[in-house]
């Protein structure tokens, strides 16, 4: 975040799905320590580093004045807190499969608009949903996230939910976006980071990619998330024919 700010790049605040946004129910507020602050032995100071994955933030307490001064001199951001717990809540929205069974894009769009309202409330700019892979195998561990085994239903449902999040009731851009995923052929969870989906061009175009095509052309999602698996021997995220 500090690097982005230094280059005047707006922060992207992510929230996972799939049934509405996913946020921490309780949190502690931290206050930024000024660059010219003096060390207070009765106060605990914190800094933090992201893990290699970028998903886990490790908090570190600064217990002595020497380290405190060094970190501030190095330009590190330090924080303090009184450890008061605050609480926040969001709505559990219907899962993708249930939304598709509504057979009503207008209803799905309103659900998306409700998700977008909560995103704006909590400062989320990118929703890591909706998932729209095809229901190929009933044993897929994330089928509940996805809409259907039918690419037309999947595409229209994704387009409707995308429009709901990304546009206001008056049709103007809301300033926040969705992430259609997982592009593409992510139809199993077991060994999904190393599996190889072997698929013909016809099956790819008519079944597995058609929903994404509809969602992109009808609703222009802000983001697309690639999948971990390979397709016909090549990783999806560096597959020239796919991208």
Task: Name every feature range the model reports, one short phrase each.
Residues 1-243:
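Glycoside hydrolase catalytic-domain context in secreted enzymes
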